[in-house]
């Protein structure tokens, strides 16, 4: 049997019932990678030797009926900005080429404790800055549904690997849509948890008030199973929330009769393609058919999400990325003749164009004379966006809309046009600014390219999000599409 497109849930049961060994699962996954990844280009590094060794250890435990761990023997791919002890972590940048961490991120510790098996590290936009995975220093990942299209970003490798059947689940990070947008483009399920739900310890920081780690899977229930394994308060991350209700699967099958869902008119407004609008309207009718009430509302400050987000995120990035100075670790320019030259040349040569663009933007926004006009004003707009959501959630359980304004664009089309690229974040950035949970699930296709439907929930109410997404998934089954790729 081939396990390449099996769900996490099915693999757990197959291993538990001794119908397959962890070694067989891992072996099949590496065979799939060998066959497909030269085309998809989703992995930056494979941890094959350690993965095979780990799987053999799990085989022995399986034989003794000692199968402890929620993800016993399940292979995983990890975005390359999440620290993995002993495995190269580059953030897809020349700046960190050859950097091998000597400690483990919290999420990796949790996944290893649940006996998941690390397959390798996944490609991304450099330092998570981009929406197409084209800013990676190493390679350009393609969309498994259409090899002329981008997979989205910044977690493009994480989404493409899952869609192509190269891992049953992956982790990504989402600062302004970097899990949900590639999930939408690649036709899979991607969740950005509530800010603070998952520890950021060991996530290479981009924008600390926005970053959040989350799972990418091919089914909603798989997504919930992975989130259960990685949530929880962490003493190493002061922003991780002391909320210990990590049971997202018990209510997942409950119907959604009587649930109140809000559809913001702005989410079907200017810039959203006709195909996306049509798919979302169909999805709304499906939700009504499931017994939910869907009503149109207004989130008037949506249009300010992108400018506010790019000022705040770039400002935080300019601060966070100042640690890459060519001295302690990372790229060290061999041509520098003084300390000042070492700083300038290491950073100029080590960072790519998009990263430098955002550092410049952030430094400018924080500079004397401009701070009030840009950074401070953006924080005020952020509060207005949060207030919009709070007002809606007084009367509604969930917000629904498209994940992205269009389907995946062609490789090369927008890489030299940053403003057009940034516009793709129209519907995802407000969720990060408000710190809310958001999930993208497939809801259609246009010319063979997937369309994503986004559900947005109240803070720490991932349970309801999963319930709605799961019920919708029962009526819109996308699972057969992956094996056709």
Curated annotation (Swiss-Prot):
SUPFAM superfamilies according to UniProt: Amidase signature (AS) enzymes (SSF75304)
InterPro entries: Amidase (IPR000120), Amidase_CS (IPR020556), Amidase_dom (IPR023631), AS_sf (IPR036928), GatA (IPR004412)
Enzyme class: ligase
Coiled coil: none
UniProt keyword annotation of Nucleotide-binding present: yes
Gene Ontology BP, a term: translation
Record key words, sorted: ATP-binding, Ligase, Nucleotide-binding, Protein biosynthesis
Domain of life per record: Bacteria
EC number: 6.3.5.7
GO molecular function: ATP binding; glutaminyl-tRNA synthase (glutamine-hydrolyzing) activity
Residues forming the catalytic site: 79 (charge relay system), 154 (charge relay system), 178 (acyl-ester intermediate)
Listed GO CC annotations: glutamyl-tRNA(Gln) amidotransferase complex
Reaction it catalyzes: L-glutamyl-tRNA(Gln) + L-glutamine + ATP + H2O = L-glutaminyl-tRNA(Gln) + L-glutamate + ADP + phosphate + H(+)
Family named by the database record: Belongs to the amidase family. GatA subfamily.
NCBIfam families in alphabetical order: gatA
Record text on subunit structure and interactions: Heterotrimer of A, B and C subunits.
Function: Allows the formation of correctly charged Gln-tRNA(Gln) through the transamidation of misacylated Glu-tRNA(Gln) in organisms which lack glutaminyl-tRNA synthetase. The reaction takes place in the presence of glutamine and ATP through an activated gamma-phospho-Glu-tRNA(Gln).
Full protein name: Glutamyl-tRNA(Gln) amidotransferase subunit A
Organism listed in the record: Staphylococcus saprophyticus subsp. saprophyticus (strain ATCC 15305 / DSM 20229 / NCIMB 8711 / NCTC 7292 / S-41)
Designated gene of the protein: gatA
């Amino acid at each position: 049997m081939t396990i390449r497109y099996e769900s996490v849930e099915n693999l757990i049961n197959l291993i538990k019932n001794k119908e397959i060994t962890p070694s067989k699962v891992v072996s099949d996954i590496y065979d799939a990678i060998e066959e497909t990844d030269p085309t998809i280009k989703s992995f930056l590094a494979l941890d094959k030797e350690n993965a095979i060794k780990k799987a053999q250890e799990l085989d022995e435990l399986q034989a003794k009926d000692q199968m402890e761990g929620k993800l016993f023997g399940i292979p995983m791919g990890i975005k390359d900005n999440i620290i993995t002890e002993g495995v190269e972590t580059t953030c897809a940048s020349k700046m960190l080429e050859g950097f091998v961490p000597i400690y483990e991120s919290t999420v990796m510790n949790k996944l290893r404790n649940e006996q998941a098996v690390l397959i390798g590290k996944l490609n991304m936009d450099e330092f998570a800055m981009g929406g197409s995975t084209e800013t990676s220093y190493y390679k350009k990942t393609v969309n498994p549904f259409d090899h002329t299209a981008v997979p989205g970003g910044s977690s493009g490798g994480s989404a493409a690997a899952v869609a192509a059947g190269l891992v049953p689940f992956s982790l990504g990070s989402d600062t302004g849509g970097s899990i949900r947008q590639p999930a939408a483009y690649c036709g899979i399920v991607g969740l950005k948890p509530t800010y603070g739900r998952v520890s950021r310890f060991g996530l290479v920081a981009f924008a600390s008030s926005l970053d959040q780690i989350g799972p990418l899977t091919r089914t909603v229930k798989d997504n919930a199973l992975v989130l259960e394994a990685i949530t929880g308060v962490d003493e190493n991350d002061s922003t991780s929330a002391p909320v210990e209700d990590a049971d997202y699967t018990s209510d997942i099958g409950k119907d959604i009769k009587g649930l109140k869902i809000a559809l913001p008119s702005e989410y079907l407004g200017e810039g959203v393609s006709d195909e996306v609008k049509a798919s979302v309207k169909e999805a709304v009718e499906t939700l009504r058919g499931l017994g939910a009430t869907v009503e149109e509302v207004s989130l008037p400050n949506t249009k300010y999400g992108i400018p506010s987000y790019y000022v705040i995120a770039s400002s935080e990035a300019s601060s966070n990325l100042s640690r890459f100075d060519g001295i302690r670790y990372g790229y060290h320019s061999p041509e520098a003749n003084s300390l000042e030259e070492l700083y300038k040349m290491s950073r100029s040569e080590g960072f790519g164009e998009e990263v430098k663009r955002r550092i410049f933007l952030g430094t400018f926004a924080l500079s004397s004379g401009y701070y009030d006009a840009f950074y401070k004003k953006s924080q005020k707009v952020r509060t207005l966006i949060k207030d919009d959501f709070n007002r809606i959630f007084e009367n509604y359980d969930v917000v629904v809309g498209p994940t992205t304004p269009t389907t995946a664009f062609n490789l090369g089309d927008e890489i030299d046009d940053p403003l057009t690229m940034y516009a793709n974040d129209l519907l995802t950035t407000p969720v990060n600014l408000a710190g809310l949970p958001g999930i993208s699930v497939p809801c259609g296709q246009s010319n063979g390219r997937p369309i994503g439907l986004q559900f947005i929930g109240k803070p720490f109410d991932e349970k309801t999000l999963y319930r709605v997404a799961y019920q919708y998934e029962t009526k819109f089954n996308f699972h057969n599409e992956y094996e056709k790729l």
